[in-house]
Amino acid sequence: ECAVIAAVGVLHWLVGHRLKTESLTGAAAVEHAFAERNILHGVWYFSGTLAVLILRKPGSAIFVNLVGCAAEMVLGNSFSFGFIFFSAALQGLFAELPFAVTRYRVFNLPMAMLSGLCTGIEYGVYLMLFRYQGVAWFSPRGIIHMISEVVGGVLIAGVFSWFLYIAIAKTGVLDRFASGRAVRFADRQQAVQPLD
């Protein structure tokens, strides 16, 4: 578990470093890069959805995000300690909302996508309030920002997390967790079904 969490922290740091070192010219290039960056924000918050899919316990997304942020901070970060930890806790909370509504009983692709959607909306609003204060909500840039966050949330934090979870579970690494055993059991059931 700790190795996965640390890997998420390193991934966050690498993506953040890449996004800060790009140089762009021209208004169209800036808007395109702005949308691309916001879609890629899903890399920062996919860990919450993945944590809930694997651990299936209340608070797991918040815990994993906070520990991942601690790993990112150890490697070095240009943001303040409080900014990062507050953001990580909010992302974890919103990643857990759809699963909490079902009392942590439904774990499937639509739930993962809904989790990514909630986190994308949360992070989009968070950035508008704390990082992009000069951007009007209904300006082209504000609309592009929110749409990009939602798309990134659904695709990266939702769909990517689901298929990553399935791929990891099929290796047998997660057999000590109920989530891993469920995937392996479903695979065995499909293997024994006769062909019609």
Give the ranges of each region predicted by the language model:
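Membrane-helix interfacial "entry" motifs
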Residues: 1, 33, 37, 53, ...
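Membrane-embedded alpha-helical hairpins and interfacial helices in multi-pass inner-membrane proteins
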Residues: 26-30, 104-196
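Alpha-helical transmembrane segments of integral membrane proteins
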Residues: 3-8, 40, 44, 59-64, ...
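Hydrophobic transmembrane alpha-helices
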Residues: 1-53
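Interfacial aromatic-anchored transmembrane helix boundaries in multi-pass membrane proteins
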Residues: 69-97, 130
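Generic transmembrane alpha-helix motif of multi-pass integral membrane proteins
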Residues: 42-61, 94-99
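Aromatic-anchored segments of alpha-helical transmembrane domains
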Residues: 9-17, 66-75, 116-127
